[in-house]
Amino acid sequence: MDSGCGTVKYQTLLTPTIAAMPETEIDLRTHHTRLLEGMARCVAAQGYADTTIADIVREAGVSRRTFYEYFTDKPGCLIALHEAASQNALAVLRSAINPDRGWEQQVEQAIAAYLGALALNPVLMRALFVDILGLGLPGLVARRRANQQLADFMREVVNQQPSGPVLLHKAMAMAVVGGINELVLQAIEQDRVAQLADLVAPASALLRAVVTAQSAVPGFEEK
């Protein structure tokens, strides 16, 4: 399919089976997925600000009417893409860890995979980290929800012993996620997305330091 958005490299949201289906066999859910894929390709190629609804529907191979069956506007589509990408990121994190290793190694593996996935496309990454915040409260809510999912995953890995102590509480996990996000945002601002792998060591060290500090505080309890 010809498109003004070009061919870009990013982690797909479509399964190969769905991507190969003819238009007549595509159900409503797949139309939604195609629109998200179209949005992702266009944003990755030309940025969010320069992407139009016409670009999205052309890339998705659907009508403008179909777009408005799912989204009220372009910001709504970006929020949906952000949520889908967040779920994809969680899948990347889960598939990266080796359950036979300790939590320190598991988390480091997950962080490396996460940052590696982000670095695949700097423009799309900027939209999901920066442009989403320009959408006001709905964008902030979507970002907060994604951060909470990452924090929950982090706690799941660190606190994996059912009968063991709680090594990482909720507030501290969110603080670590916030710190990692700030490192990523700094890399975006400084045009160092290609070097995101350099953040694996400090991000992992931050988590270890927080866990160590939390265990050293007498009477520290979940709030």
Predicted feature locations:
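N-terminal intrinsically disordered/low-complexity leader segments
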Residues: 1-30, 158, 215-223
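Amphipathic alpha-helical packing segments from all-alpha helical-bundle domains
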Residues: 137-162, 170-182, 197-205
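Helix-turn-helix
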Residues: 34, 42-76, 80
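Short, structured motif recognition centered on aromatic/hydrophobic residues
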Residues: 89, 127-128, 180
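Amphipathic alpha-helical segments used for helix-helix packing
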Residues: 118-138, 155, 185
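Generic hydrophobic, amphipathic alpha-helix propensity
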Residues: 28-39, 56, 81-89, 93
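Hydrophobic alpha-helical connector segments
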Residues: 80, 94-120
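Amphipathic C-terminal alpha-helical segment
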Residues: 117, 156, 170-194, 206-220
